[in-house]
């Protein structure tokens, strides 16, 4: 599935934790999503997915979440966008 990255950012909190997010639109989807990434070591990542602009259909959100769980390339593309935005 093709995705359009709208914006991304990454920052460190307390010199330990990483927090970042990527706002994106997936091909064929009406909604714009934001995925927030969190890591304590910069290697193992948790995420939270939500709608960006306004609430949408819960089924649509669950389908996107399942897609992210099963499509490593898409997940990594979104994470890489956030990591690339981290100031060196």
Kindly give the residue locations of the regions a language model identified.
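Short, charged/polar N-terminal "headpieces" of proteins
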Residues: 1-32
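Acidic, low-complexity intrinsically disordered segments
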Residues: 36-88
